Amino acid sequence: MATDIAPSSTPQCPDHIVFEHVTKEFGTRSGTVQALDDVSLTIKRGSISAVIGHSGAGKSTLVRLINGLETPTSGRVLVDGTDFSQLSDKAMRPLRADIGMIFQQFNLFGSRTIYDNVAYPLKLAHWKKADEKKRITELLSFVGLTSKAWDHPDQLSGGQKQRVGIARALATKPSILLADESTSALDPETTADVLSLLKRVNAELGVTVVVITHEMEVVRSIAQQVSVLAAGHLVEPGTARQAFAHPQSETTQRFLATIIGQHPNGEEQARLQSENPHARLVDVSSVASHSFGDALARISHTGASFQIVHGGVIEVHDGSLGNYTVALSGPAQAVEQAVQILEEVSNSAAPTTSATVPTPTEEAH
């Protein structure tokens, strides 16, 4: 079935969406507003890429530039190597048909059945009746709503409505699917179901999925690439794993703090130190779980003792990452070796206190 409903496979450039030094400005009564400022990014064909930012970061403008609803003030946006801004509206229509989109509020026609909602873009594209019926049947099966074909949207749950939205967005076999805050109105369990379906869209159909979100949990669950926007600037481009393991911007670090266990604050540090009076507390940030395990194995051979006294772990696209606080004790030289080992695997490994490291005769038991 996946082969039947996938986009047509013709040779295409591997860089599916490219922003080249894109700036977008809007004129207002109070002056010029710069929505995007010199943004350059590349979204690979067949990837799941997330664009994350707070309200006003420029996410919506970026989406409208991808589907050609806005043109850059300067720079270029290339989709499949084509600069939409150089085309007439007529020339852009077939290219826009290659981009599907789903929304936070579903945007379904309440007076139409689920079948007719999915049929809508096919009718606009003048599909033959037999082909239209076959396509809708395939899509409703793919999203798990075959039994709901003749229901109306008000008979469906939020998650089911978003599944209809996905089926409709895929109707004309687009090679790109834009998901604009598509899970923001859903509960966590339903969000997970929708994200799982988007993964299938990508894996089984080969569709390039671009997720626009303000939720780091969505990025963690689905993204291979991530672009972090702040006040119109691209502050963190790269793979999702890079962003989680080695966040370069304060914005990314704040987003990460919402989903991964943070290091102890001052009061918690004081409590942990009082519970481990002879230990040196070391924070280890954004470390891969397997690397952390290897580091602890090496520390066990230094003569230092260790105990994990605080921490949290998250699963990301291709592994797991964690923040930990480790209590180290033993001979001073051994503890220094242990700190160096932790620094090798950590984005940031540093003592949280200036506690005196005990000598061998003082060592805690």
Feature map (PLM): residue ranges:
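ABC ATPase NBD coupling module
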Residues: 28-33, 84-100, 124-129, 243-247
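Helix-to-loop junction immediately C-terminal to a conserved catalytic motif
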Residues: 67
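A short, surface-exposed alpha-helical micro-motif characterized by mixed small hydrophobic
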Residues: 219-221
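ABC ATPase "signature
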Residues: 237-238, 246
